[in-house]
Regions:
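Secondary-structure boundary elements
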Residues: 135-143, 170-176, 211-220
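Short acidic, glycine/proline-rich loop/turn micro-motifs
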Residues: 186-192, 234-238
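Metal-dependent nuclease catalytic cores that hydrolyze phosphodiester bonds in DNA/RNA
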Residues: 1-163, 273
Length: 292
C-alpha cells in the first residue's frame, strides 16, 4: 500500500502492512535488533483473536457510536443455558451440553469480525462513557475529533517506512488523544504502566507521523485519556509534557536509525548494540539488593 492518510483501513488490514514499522516493532528493537528480526521471521497473521475485549469495545462506543452494532457483539450465555435446559431439564451443567456449545459456536462464527463482550462488560462500558461525558473537556475533545486515522509514511531522516494510528486527533486545538483503559487509572499506577508498556514511544511515533505526513503542522498537546474499567470509573487526561516529548523523540529517532541500518546492511545485532565501546562489551550492573 502507498504512503498516505487513510480513513477506512480495518485494524487487521492495518496490522498486516508489514512493510511499515509501527511502535510495537520499534519497542522490540530497543531490546535488540535480533529480537525484532526473530519476531518478524516468526510472525504470522492469525487475524483478530476472539476474546472479551473491554478496551476496544469501549473505544468503539466512545468514538464510533454509529457503528456499534456492526463492530460489537454481546454474548447470550443466559439464553444458551435456557435453550440447553429446555432440551434437557435435568442438566446439572448446561454450559457443557451439546446445545449450549452449538449456540455458542454459532454466535462466535456469526460475529468473527466483531469485538466480543459480555452483558456485564457492556454495563461497565456504559459507566465508563458516563464518566467521560460528565467531563466537559473530555466530552468536547471526543465529539470534535477525527478517529482512527491510519498514517503511512517514510521517515524524514532515514526513509524507513513507518505507520501509526492515533485514536483521536482534535484539529482545532492540534491535539492527539490516546485512549487507555485500566483497572487503576491513578497517577501512581498509570505512570508505572507508561514505563512498563512504553506508551511514550508509541506517543512519539504518533506525533512524528502526524507532523511528517502533513496531517497537522504542529502538535500543541498530547493527552492520554485513561478510563478505569471498574468502579469508580474515573476518566483522567494525562499530558505528555514537552520536555518528555523531546527526550523520547530523540530516543525514537535513534532506534529508527538502528533499524534502518540493519535493513540496509542485513546485520542485526544483539545486546551488544547497547555498549558504549566499539568492542560491544557491556558492563554488568548488579542490582541494588545484591549490594546490600
Amino acid at each position: 500500500m502507498k504512503t498516505g492518510i487513510y480513513d477506512s483501513i480495518e485494524i487487521n488490514d492495518y496490522h498486516a502492512l508489514r512493510d511499515y514499522y509501527n511502535s510495537t516493532r520499534i519497542k522490540l528493537a530497543k531490546k535488540s535488533l535480533n529480537t525484532l528480526k526473530s519476531h518478524d521471521e516468526n510472525w504470522k497473521d492469525e487475524g483478530r483473536k476472539q476474546h472479551y475485549d473491554t478496551g476496544n469495545a469501549f473505544e468503539v462506543m466512545l468514538t464510533d457510536k454509529e457503528n456499534i452494532e456492526n463492530r460489537i457483539a454481546i454474548t447470550n450465555e443466559e439464553d444458551w443455558r435456557n435453550e440447553a435446559l429446555k432440551d434437557n431439564p435435568k442438566l446439572s451443567e448446561p454450559s457443557r451440553s451439546k446445545v449450549y456449545r452449538e449456540l455458542k459456536d454459532k454466535f462466535y462464527g456469526d460475529n468473527k469480525s466483531k469485538y466480543i463482550i459480555t452483558p456485564s462488560i457492556q454495563d461497565d462500558c456504559l459507566e465508563m462513557l458516563k464518566s467521560c461525558y460528565s467531563d466537559e473537556l473530555i466530552r468536547s475533545l471526543v465529539k470534535e475529533s477525527d478517529s482512527q486515522k491510519s498514517i503511512l509514511w517514510h521517515c524524514a531522516n532515514t526513509g524507513l517506512k513507518l505507520k501509526t494510528r492515533p485514536d483521536l486527533i482534535h484539529h482545532k486545538s492540534k491535539t492527539i488523544i490516546d485512549i487507555k483503559t485500566a483497572d487503576d487509572g491513578s497517577p501512581e499506577k498509570f505512570s508505572k504502566s507508561c514505563v512498563n508498556l512504553d506508551y511514550p514511544l508509541q506517543a512519539s511515533l504518533q506525533i512524528k507521523g502526524v507532523l511528517e505526513s502533513g496531517l497537522l503542522d504542529e502538535v500543541k498537546n498530547y493527552f492520554w485519556l485513561v478510563v478505569e474499567k471498574n468502579s469508580p470509573y474515573n476518566a483522567t487526561l494525562y499530558r505528555f509534557t514537552k520536555d518528555d516529548q523531546e527526550m523520547v523523540a530523540d530516543s525514537l529517532d535513534y532506534y529508527i536509525g538502528h533499524i534502518n541500518e540493519a535493513v540496509n546492511s542485513g546485520i542485526w545485532g544483539g545486546y551488544n548494540q547497547r555498549a558504549d565501546n566499539k568492542l560491544g562489551i557491556l558492563d554488568l550492573e548488579l542490582p541494588l539488593y545484591y549490594r546490600r
